[in-house]
Amino acid sequence: MSIKVLVTTGCGNTVMGGADIWTNYFLELVWPTLPVKRDWRLLIDSKRPASFESKYLPKGLVHHFHYDDPEKTRTWLDECEEIHVLHPHYHLRPHIWHFEDKFKTVFVHAYAREMDAAISAIPELKRLQYNTQVDSDFYDEYLATFNRRIWVGNNTTTMIDEHPNYTYNVPNFYEFKNNLPLTTHVDNGKIGFASRIESRKCVHWLNDHKGYILTNQFDLQNLKDSSTYSLKGMEVFQWDVNHHHFFMLKNFGIFHAAYFKEPFGYSIFQAVDYGKLPIINKDWAPEVEYKYRVSTKNEFDECVKQILKDSHEERVTNIKNLKEYMIKFDNKDVWIDKIRTAILG
Protein backbone atom coordinates (compact mmCIF):
# COMPACT_ATOMS: atom_id res chain seq x y z
CA MET A 1 0.00 0.00 0.00
CA SER A 2 1.39 3.40 -1.08
CA ILE A 3 -0.10 5.88 1.41
CA LYS A 4 -0.57 9.49 0.32
CA VAL A 5 -1.76 12.14 2.76
CA LEU A 6 -3.94 15.11 1.85
CA VAL A 7 -3.61 18.00 4.32
CA THR A 8 -6.13 20.78 4.84
CA THR A 9 -7.29 23.19 7.54
CA GLY A 10 -11.04 22.59 7.36
CA CYS A 11 -13.77 20.87 5.37
CA GLY A 12 -17.09 19.07 5.60
CA ASN A 13 -20.12 20.75 7.14
CA THR A 14 -18.08 23.32 9.10
CA VAL A 15 -17.26 25.60 6.17
CA MET A 16 -15.63 28.88 7.22
CA GLY A 17 -14.57 30.29 3.87
CA GLY A 18 -13.79 29.79 0.23
CA ALA A 19 -10.82 27.48 0.90
CA ASP A 20 -13.09 25.06 2.77
CA ILE A 21 -15.56 25.12 -0.12
CA TRP A 22 -12.70 24.40 -2.54
CA THR A 23 -11.52 21.51 -0.37
CA ASN A 24 -15.02 20.05 -0.24
CA TYR A 25 -15.21 20.16 -4.03
CA PHE A 26 -11.85 18.43 -4.26
CA LEU A 27 -12.97 15.65 -1.93
CA GLU A 28 -16.32 15.25 -3.67
CA LEU A 29 -15.20 15.52 -7.29
CA VAL A 30 -11.47 14.80 -7.57
CA TRP A 31 -10.66 12.29 -4.83
CA PRO A 32 -13.02 9.61 -6.26
CA THR A 33 -11.13 9.80 -9.58
CA LEU A 34 -7.66 9.29 -8.09
CA PRO A 35 -5.93 5.94 -8.68
CA VAL A 36 -6.42 3.53 -5.75
CA LYS A 37 -8.37 6.16 -3.83
CA ARG A 38 -8.26 4.11 -0.62
CA ASP A 39 -4.53 4.89 -0.43
CA TRP A 40 -5.31 8.60 0.05
CA ARG A 41 -5.96 9.82 3.61
CA LEU A 42 -7.18 13.21 4.80
CA LEU A 43 -5.37 15.01 7.63
CA ILE A 44 -7.36 17.99 8.91
CA ASP A 45 -4.71 20.12 10.60
CA SER A 46 -6.92 21.75 13.21
CA LYS A 47 -9.12 21.08 16.21
CA ARG A 48 -12.32 19.16 15.58
CA PRO A 49 -15.24 21.64 15.56
CA ALA A 50 -18.03 20.69 17.97
CA SER A 51 -20.55 20.63 15.11
CA PHE A 52 -18.43 18.55 12.72
CA GLU A 53 -20.16 15.47 11.30
CA SER A 54 -18.21 12.84 9.38
CA LYS A 55 -21.23 11.97 7.24
CA TYR A 56 -20.61 15.11 5.20
CA LEU A 57 -17.30 13.74 3.92
CA PRO A 58 -17.20 11.25 1.02
CA LYS A 59 -17.92 7.69 2.05
CA GLY A 60 -14.76 5.63 2.42
CA LEU A 61 -12.40 8.58 2.92
CA VAL A 62 -10.21 7.92 5.95
CA HIS A 63 -9.77 11.18 7.87
CA HIS A 64 -8.23 12.43 11.10
CA PHE A 65 -8.11 15.72 13.02
CA HIS A 66 -4.56 16.48 14.16
CA TYR A 67 -5.51 17.55 17.68
CA ASP A 68 -7.59 14.43 18.27
CA ASP A 69 -4.34 12.47 18.41
CA PRO A 70 -1.06 14.17 17.39
CA GLU A 71 0.76 10.85 17.59
CA LYS A 72 -1.54 9.45 14.91
CA THR A 73 -0.64 12.42 12.73
CA ARG A 74 3.04 11.60 13.13
CA THR A 75 2.43 7.94 12.31
CA TRP A 76 0.51 8.83 9.14
CA LEU A 77 3.17 11.25 7.94
CA ASP A 78 5.98 8.89 8.85
CA GLU A 79 4.42 5.99 6.93
CA CYS A 80 3.22 7.88 3.86
CA GLU A 81 5.15 8.34 0.63
CA GLU A 82 3.64 11.66 -0.47
CA ILE A 83 2.10 14.75 1.14
CA HIS A 84 -0.25 16.99 -0.86
CA VAL A 85 -1.56 20.15 0.83
CA LEU A 86 -5.06 21.21 -0.20
CA HIS A 87 -5.03 24.32 1.99
CA PRO A 88 -2.09 25.27 4.23
CA HIS A 89 -1.74 27.37 7.33
CA TYR A 90 0.25 30.58 6.84
CA HIS A 91 2.74 29.87 9.62
CA LEU A 92 5.05 27.08 10.75
CA ARG A 93 3.38 23.79 11.68
CA PRO A 94 6.35 21.77 13.00
CA HIS A 95 4.59 18.40 12.81
CA ILE A 96 4.02 18.97 9.06
CA TRP A 97 7.31 20.72 8.28
CA HIS A 98 9.29 17.81 9.74
CA PHE A 99 8.31 15.75 6.69
CA GLU A 100 9.19 18.32 4.02
CA ASP A 101 11.04 15.70 1.97
CA LYS A 102 7.64 14.17 1.14
CA PHE A 103 5.99 17.41 -0.01
CA LYS A 104 4.61 17.10 -3.55
CA THR A 105 1.76 19.52 -4.34
CA VAL A 106 0.43 22.60 -2.55
CA PHE A 107 -2.69 24.49 -3.57
CA VAL A 108 -2.32 28.18 -2.77
CA HIS A 109 -5.51 30.07 -1.93
CA ALA A 110 -3.86 33.30 -0.80
CA TYR A 111 -0.28 34.51 -0.93
CA ALA A 112 0.92 35.53 2.53
CA ARG A 113 3.29 38.25 1.33
CA GLU A 114 0.46 39.95 -0.56
CA MET A 115 -1.80 39.70 2.48
CA ASP A 116 0.83 41.45 4.60
CA ALA A 117 1.48 44.05 1.90
CA ALA A 118 -2.19 44.96 1.70
CA ILE A 119 -2.33 45.53 5.45
CA SER A 120 0.92 47.52 5.57
CA ALA A 121 -0.02 49.80 2.67
CA ILE A 122 -3.24 51.05 4.25
CA PRO A 123 -2.90 52.83 7.62
CA GLU A 124 -6.47 52.14 8.76
CA LEU A 125 -6.00 48.39 8.26
CA LYS A 126 -2.78 48.35 10.29
CA ARG A 127 -4.80 49.50 13.31
CA LEU A 128 -7.26 46.62 13.07
CA GLN A 129 -6.98 43.10 14.39
CA TYR A 130 -5.36 40.77 11.85
CA ASN A 131 -7.41 37.62 12.25
CA THR A 132 -5.09 35.17 10.51
CA GLN A 133 -1.63 34.30 11.87
CA VAL A 134 0.78 34.95 9.02
CA ASP A 135 4.53 34.49 8.66
CA SER A 136 5.37 35.62 5.14
CA ASP A 137 9.04 34.66 5.20
CA PHE A 138 8.34 31.15 6.40
CA TYR A 139 5.44 30.77 3.97
CA ASP A 140 7.71 31.50 1.01
CA GLU A 141 10.23 28.96 2.26
CA TYR A 142 7.40 26.48 2.77
CA LEU A 143 6.06 26.92 -0.77
CA ALA A 144 9.55 26.49 -2.22
CA THR A 145 9.86 22.98 -0.77
CA PHE A 146 6.99 21.57 -2.87
CA ASN A 147 7.47 20.00 -6.28
CA ARG A 148 4.43 21.86 -7.62
CA ARG A 149 2.51 24.98 -6.57
CA ILE A 150 -1.02 25.56 -7.84
CA TRP A 151 -2.53 29.05 -7.60
CA VAL A 152 -6.32 28.72 -7.40
CA GLY A 153 -7.15 32.40 -7.91
CA ASN A 154 -8.56 34.17 -10.95
CA ASN A 155 -6.47 37.24 -10.13
CA THR A 156 -2.75 37.49 -10.82
CA THR A 157 -0.28 36.98 -7.98
CA THR A 158 3.34 37.87 -7.33
CA MET A 159 3.77 34.33 -6.00
CA ILE A 160 4.29 33.19 -9.58
CA ASP A 161 7.09 35.75 -9.94
CA GLU A 162 8.70 34.60 -6.68
CA HIS A 163 8.33 30.90 -7.54
CA PRO A 164 8.31 30.80 -11.36
CA ASN A 165 9.29 27.16 -11.82
CA TYR A 166 6.66 24.46 -11.54
CA THR A 167 4.01 26.94 -10.44
CA TYR A 168 0.70 26.78 -12.27
CA ASN A 169 -2.62 28.57 -12.27
CA VAL A 170 -5.81 26.50 -12.07
CA PRO A 171 -8.57 28.94 -11.05
CA ASN A 172 -11.44 27.81 -8.87
CA PHE A 173 -14.82 27.23 -10.50
CA TYR A 174 -18.28 28.51 -9.67
CA GLU A 175 -21.56 27.02 -10.86
CA PHE A 176 -24.38 29.52 -11.21
CA LYS A 177 -27.42 27.76 -9.74
CA ASN A 178 -29.73 30.63 -8.79
CA ASN A 179 -29.30 33.13 -11.63
CA LEU A 180 -31.56 35.65 -9.92
CA PRO A 181 -32.09 39.01 -11.64
CA LEU A 182 -30.72 42.11 -9.97
CA THR A 183 -32.98 42.84 -7.02
CA THR A 184 -34.79 46.15 -6.64
CA HIS A 185 -33.87 46.03 -2.93
CA VAL A 186 -30.81 48.00 -4.03
CA ASP A 187 -32.98 51.09 -3.63
CA ASN A 188 -33.40 50.64 0.14
CA GLY A 189 -29.66 51.19 0.63
CA LYS A 190 -29.17 48.15 2.84
CA ILE A 191 -25.87 46.32 2.45
CA GLY A 192 -25.00 42.67 3.02
CA PHE A 193 -21.68 41.13 4.06
CA ALA A 194 -21.10 37.36 4.25
CA SER A 195 -17.48 36.47 4.87
CA ARG A 196 -14.82 35.92 7.51
CA ILE A 197 -13.59 38.86 9.55
CA GLU A 198 -10.12 39.66 8.23
CA SER A 199 -8.54 43.10 8.14
CA ARG A 200 -8.22 43.02 4.35
CA LYS A 201 -11.97 42.42 3.97
CA CYS A 202 -12.77 45.82 5.49
CA VAL A 203 -16.02 44.99 7.25
CA HIS A 204 -15.52 48.25 9.20
CA TRP A 205 -16.44 50.15 6.04
CA LEU A 206 -20.03 49.23 6.92
CA ASN A 207 -19.89 51.64 9.85
CA ASP A 208 -22.67 54.26 9.44
CA HIS A 209 -24.54 52.00 7.01
CA LYS A 210 -27.54 49.74 7.49
CA GLY A 211 -27.84 46.11 6.55
CA TYR A 212 -26.85 42.60 7.55
CA ILE A 213 -23.65 40.73 8.40
CA LEU A 214 -23.23 36.95 8.34
CA THR A 215 -19.93 36.06 10.01
CA ASN A 216 -18.31 34.77 13.19
CA GLN A 217 -19.82 36.97 15.89
CA PHE A 218 -16.83 36.50 18.21
CA ASP A 219 -14.41 37.88 15.60
CA LEU A 220 -16.72 40.79 14.86
CA GLN A 221 -17.02 41.62 18.56
CA ASN A 222 -13.23 41.62 18.83
CA LEU A 223 -13.13 44.17 16.02
CA LYS A 224 -15.66 46.38 17.82
CA ASP A 225 -13.85 46.08 21.15
CA SER A 226 -10.49 47.01 19.64
CA SER A 227 -11.65 49.95 17.50
CA THR A 228 -14.11 52.84 17.38
CA TYR A 229 -16.36 51.07 14.87
CA SER A 230 -19.75 50.22 16.36
CA LEU A 231 -21.52 48.98 13.19
CA LYS A 232 -24.72 49.78 15.06
CA GLY A 233 -26.77 49.91 11.86
CA MET A 234 -25.89 46.34 10.95
CA GLU A 235 -27.87 43.31 12.10
CA VAL A 236 -25.45 40.46 12.78
CA PHE A 237 -26.04 36.75 12.25
CA GLN A 238 -23.72 33.96 13.40
CA TRP A 239 -21.98 32.26 10.50
CA ASP A 240 -23.41 28.89 9.52
CA VAL A 241 -23.06 27.52 6.02
CA ASN A 242 -26.63 26.24 6.26
CA HIS A 243 -27.90 29.79 6.85
CA HIS A 244 -26.12 31.33 3.87
CA HIS A 245 -28.90 30.73 1.32
CA PHE A 246 -31.55 32.35 3.50
CA PHE A 247 -29.23 35.23 4.36
CA MET A 248 -28.69 35.99 0.68
CA LEU A 249 -32.46 36.20 0.17
CA LYS A 250 -32.86 38.97 2.76
CA ASN A 251 -34.03 42.42 1.74
CA PHE A 252 -30.72 44.02 0.82
CA GLY A 253 -29.47 44.75 -2.67
CA ILE A 254 -25.89 45.96 -2.27
CA PHE A 255 -23.17 43.49 -1.29
CA HIS A 256 -19.88 44.54 0.33
CA ALA A 257 -17.17 42.54 -1.44
CA ALA A 258 -14.43 45.18 -1.60
CA TYR A 259 -11.78 42.91 -0.13
CA PHE A 260 -8.13 43.68 -0.81
CA LYS A 261 -6.08 41.02 -2.63
CA GLU A 262 -8.97 38.60 -2.99
CA PRO A 263 -7.61 35.56 -4.89
CA PHE A 264 -10.85 34.17 -6.32
CA GLY A 265 -13.76 35.86 -4.63
CA TYR A 266 -16.27 33.06 -4.14
CA SER A 267 -18.61 35.40 -2.25
CA ILE A 268 -18.48 37.89 -5.15
CA PHE A 269 -19.71 35.17 -7.49
CA GLN A 270 -22.41 34.26 -4.96
CA ALA A 271 -23.57 37.87 -4.75
CA VAL A 272 -24.10 38.05 -8.52
CA ASP A 273 -25.77 34.62 -8.51
CA TYR A 274 -28.28 35.87 -5.91
CA GLY A 275 -29.00 39.10 -7.76
CA LYS A 276 -27.08 41.38 -5.39
CA LEU A 277 -24.96 44.27 -6.67
CA PRO A 278 -21.41 43.86 -5.33
CA ILE A 279 -19.08 46.70 -4.50
CA ILE A 280 -15.66 45.25 -5.32
CA ASN A 281 -12.08 46.35 -4.84
CA LYS A 282 -10.18 48.13 -7.58
CA ASP A 283 -7.63 45.31 -7.58
CA TRP A 284 -10.15 42.51 -8.30
CA ALA A 285 -10.46 41.49 -11.98
CA PRO A 286 -9.39 44.97 -13.13
CA GLU A 287 -9.80 43.93 -16.77
CA VAL A 288 -13.60 43.91 -16.34
CA GLU A 289 -15.52 47.09 -17.07
CA TYR A 290 -17.36 47.54 -13.79
CA LYS A 291 -18.33 50.83 -12.22
CA TYR A 292 -18.69 49.99 -8.54
CA ARG A 293 -15.07 49.69 -7.36
CA VAL A 294 -13.40 51.20 -4.31
CA SER A 295 -10.19 51.11 -2.30
CA THR A 296 -10.96 53.35 0.71
CA LYS A 297 -13.74 53.87 3.24
CA ASN A 298 -14.53 57.27 1.71
CA GLU A 299 -14.78 55.76 -1.77
CA PHE A 300 -17.01 53.03 -0.38
CA ASP A 301 -19.42 55.59 1.11
CA GLU A 302 -19.46 57.59 -2.12
CA CYS A 303 -20.01 54.42 -4.16
CA VAL A 304 -23.11 53.57 -2.13
CA LYS A 305 -24.45 57.07 -2.83
CA GLN A 306 -23.69 56.66 -6.55
CA ILE A 307 -25.47 53.31 -6.69
CA LEU A 308 -28.57 54.86 -5.15
CA LYS A 309 -28.46 57.68 -7.73
CA ASP A 310 -28.01 55.35 -10.70
CA SER A 311 -30.94 53.93 -12.61
CA HIS A 312 -31.83 50.27 -12.39
CA GLU A 313 -30.77 49.94 -16.04
CA GLU A 314 -27.30 51.33 -15.27
CA ARG A 315 -26.86 48.85 -12.44
CA VAL A 316 -28.06 45.95 -14.61
CA THR A 317 -25.56 46.86 -17.34
CA ASN A 318 -22.71 46.73 -14.84
CA ILE A 319 -23.69 43.47 -13.20
CA LYS A 320 -24.14 41.95 -16.66
CA ASN A 321 -20.53 42.86 -17.50
CA LEU A 322 -19.36 41.23 -14.30
CA LYS A 323 -21.37 38.06 -14.83
CA GLU A 324 -20.11 37.66 -18.40
CA TYR A 325 -16.59 37.58 -16.97
CA MET A 326 -17.59 35.11 -14.24
CA ILE A 327 -19.29 32.65 -16.57
CA LYS A 328 -15.96 31.50 -17.98
CA PHE A 329 -15.21 29.93 -14.59
CA ASP A 330 -18.43 27.90 -14.70
CA ASN A 331 -16.90 24.68 -16.04
CA LYS A 332 -16.66 22.02 -13.37
CA ASP A 333 -15.48 19.20 -15.65
CA VAL A 334 -12.50 21.20 -16.92
CA TRP A 335 -11.59 22.09 -13.33
CA ILE A 336 -11.74 18.44 -12.21
CA ASP A 337 -9.46 17.35 -15.04
CA LYS A 338 -6.89 20.09 -14.40
CA ILE A 339 -6.78 19.55 -10.64
CA ARG A 340 -6.45 15.79 -11.05
CA THR A 341 -3.61 16.28 -13.52
CA ALA A 342 -1.91 18.72 -11.17
CA ILE A 343 -1.94 16.46 -8.13
CA LEU A 344 -0.80 13.41 -10.08
CA GLY A 345 2.10 15.37 -11.54
Where are these regions (language model features)?
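A short, glycine/small-residue-rich beta-strand->loop->alpha-helix junction that serves as a flexible
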Residues: 8-25, 50, 199-201
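Short beta-strand->alpha-helix junction loop in the catalytic core
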Residues: 112-114, 155-156, 166-181, 219-220, ...
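Membrane-proximal helix-turn-helix segments that form the acceptor-binding/catalytic region
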Residues: 113-151
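Conserved catalytic-core segment of nucleotide-activated headgroup transferases in glycan assembly
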Residues: 176-179, 184-230, 236-241
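Short alpha-helical segment that forms part of, or immediately flanks, the ligand-binding pocket
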Residues: 245-246, 268-273
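Nucleotide-sugar-dependent
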Residues: 255-268, 282-290
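Short hydrophobic beta-strand element within catalytic cores of glycosyltransferases
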Residues: 276-281
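A charged, aromatic-enriched C-terminal amphipathic alpha-helix characteristic of glycosyltransferases
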Residues: 295-301, 309-344
